[in-house]
């Protein structure tokens, strides 16, 4: 068991979505292994409130929500809420006395980052997406060090490209995931996020039925909360229930990636980084309502490497999906080459790079 050194303390701010929380957890676990004491700053209503304690880390909460909105009362109240949340973050910092603060996105990062600088602490920012969120755009002006996953993420701010931290088990999977090309059924992993992706749920039953007429295909489809029965019934109606595993959630993504030949998914930053790390080809459908369309830019890294196909949702239909899957089912050599090209775009030491910057700025190297 790692001995925690109470003279090495870091406050990590990340929350709201898995794209923020899981990379931060990777860094937290690495630093914990190096003897650091880790404390988390988040919000009580978002996923970090459940996930962070499950992974063994203490978490403090501040009261802050998104400030984008058009209501007059919302706009008038926003400055007072932000000031209150900064004061709450300052209280956490005063009690915990961290040596460095790491912000990785989410509502708590804004007030926490300001509180860190007001307290005279080094602030490290990490932006996971190819286009930064509003909070990181603002904090980048006052941060001690800005890190990012992709080239040309920030305008007029010097940032070091380090990649996205991902779980160690997925990096290990990528090292062993180079399987020989086989003539077995094409294994398609469909991942739509915690709420599922309606476009995948609507199209994949008929797509699977069409592809199965010419090629052997099996599907593992994560449909999201509340969608299980409807999607499962549609697969059954089309006679595909025997070749499909339909689930609301996939708890073990390592097992899912190990099983898959190709992934149909959104192009959130974490998903893109994980697919690259495990060396899987992908069909990327960016979420069309993402802020600043950042998912399309995220996808370009794998598309330009030749490891993925980009399928904008505005032009996506069953025929396009059928065509892509038939091509991949027919040419297993190309499927394998796409996986290798995806792997070539992966950054596998991002966790260590982020941690080393935090250690250096804390003066603990």
From Swiss-Prot:
It is found in: Cell inner membrane. Its EC number is 2.4.1.227. It catalyses: di-trans,octa-cis-undecaprenyl diphospho-N-acetyl-alpha-D-muramoyl-L-alanyl-D-glutamyl-meso-2,6-diaminopimeloyl-D-alanyl-D-alanine + UDP-N-acetyl-alpha-D-glucosamine = di-trans,octa-cis-undecaprenyl diphospho-[N-acetyl-alpha-D-glucosaminyl-(1->4)]-N-acetyl-alpha-D-muramoyl-L-alanyl-D-glutamyl-meso-2,6-diaminopimeloyl-D-alanyl-D-alanine + UDP + H(+). Pfam families: Glyco_tran_28_C (PF04101), Glyco_transf_28 (PF03033). GO terms for molecular function: UDP-N-acetyl-D-glucosamine:N-acetylmuramoyl-L-alanyl-D-glutamyl-meso-2,6-diaminopimelyl-D-alanyl-D-alanine-diphosphoundecaprenol 4-beta-N-acetylglucosaminlytransferase activity; undecaprenyldiphospho-muramoylpentapeptide beta-N-acetylglucosaminyltransferase activity. UDP-N-acetyl-alpha-D-glucosamine binds at residues 17-19, 129, 167, 194, 250, 269-274, 295. GO terms for biological process: carbohydrate metabolic process; cell division; cell wall organization; lipid glycosylation; peptidoglycan biosynthetic process; regulation of cell shape. Cell wall formation. Catalyzes the transfer of a GlcNAc subunit on undecaprenyl-pyrophosphoryl-MurNAc-pentapeptide (lipid intermediate I) to form undecaprenyl-pyrophosphoryl-MurNAc-(pentapeptide)GlcNAc (lipid intermediate II). Belongs to the glycosyltransferase 28 family. MurG subfamily. This is UDP-N-acetylglucosamine--N-acetylmuramyl-(pentapeptide) pyrophosphoryl-undecaprenol N-acetylglucosamine transferase.
């Amino acid at each position: 068991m790692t001995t925690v050194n109470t003279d090495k303390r870091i406050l990590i701010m990340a929350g709201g979505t898995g794209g923020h929380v899981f990379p931060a957890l990777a860094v937290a676990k690495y630093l914990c292994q190096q003897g650091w004491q880790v404390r988390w700053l988040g919000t009580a209503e978002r996923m970090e409130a459940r996930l962070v304690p499950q992974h063994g880390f203490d978490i403090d909460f501040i009261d802050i929500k998104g400030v984008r909105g058009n209501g007059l009362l919302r706009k008038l109240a926003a400055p007072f809420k932000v000031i209150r949340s900064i004061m709450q973050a300052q209280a956490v910092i005063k009690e915990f006395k961290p040596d460095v603060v790491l912000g990785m996105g989410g509502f708590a990062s804004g007030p926490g980052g300001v509180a860190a600088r007001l307290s005279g602490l080094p602030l490290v920012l990490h932006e996971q997406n190819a286009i930064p969120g509003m909070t990181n755009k603002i904090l980048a002006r006052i941060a001690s060090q800005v890190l990012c996953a992709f080239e040309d993420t920030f305008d007029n701010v010097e940032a070091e490209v380090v990649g996205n931290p991902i779980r160690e088990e997925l990096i290990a999977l990528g090292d062993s995931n180079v399987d020989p090309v086989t003539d077995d059924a094409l294994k398609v992993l469909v991942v739509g996020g915690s709420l599922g992706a309606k476009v995948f749920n609507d199209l994949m039953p008929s797509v699977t039925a069409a592809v199965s007429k010419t090629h052997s295909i099996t599907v593992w489809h994560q449909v999201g909360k509340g969608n299980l029965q409807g999607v499962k019934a549609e697969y059954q109606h089309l006679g595909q229930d025997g070749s499909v595993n339909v689930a609301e959630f996939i708890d073990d993504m390592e097992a899912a990636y190990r099983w898959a030949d190709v992934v149909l998914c959104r192009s959130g930053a974490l998903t893109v980084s994980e697919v690259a790390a495990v060396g899987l080809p992908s069909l990327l459908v960016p979420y069309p309502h993402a802020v600043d369309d950042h998912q399309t830019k995220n996808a370009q890294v794998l598309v330009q490497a030749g490891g993925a196909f980009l399928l904008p949702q505005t032009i996506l239909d069953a025929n396009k999906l059928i065509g892509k899957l038939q091509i991949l089912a027919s040419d297993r050599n190309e499927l394998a080459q796409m996986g290798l090209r995806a792997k070539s775009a992966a950054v596998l030491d991002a966790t260590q790079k982020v941690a080393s910057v935090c250690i250096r700025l804390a003066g603990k190297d």
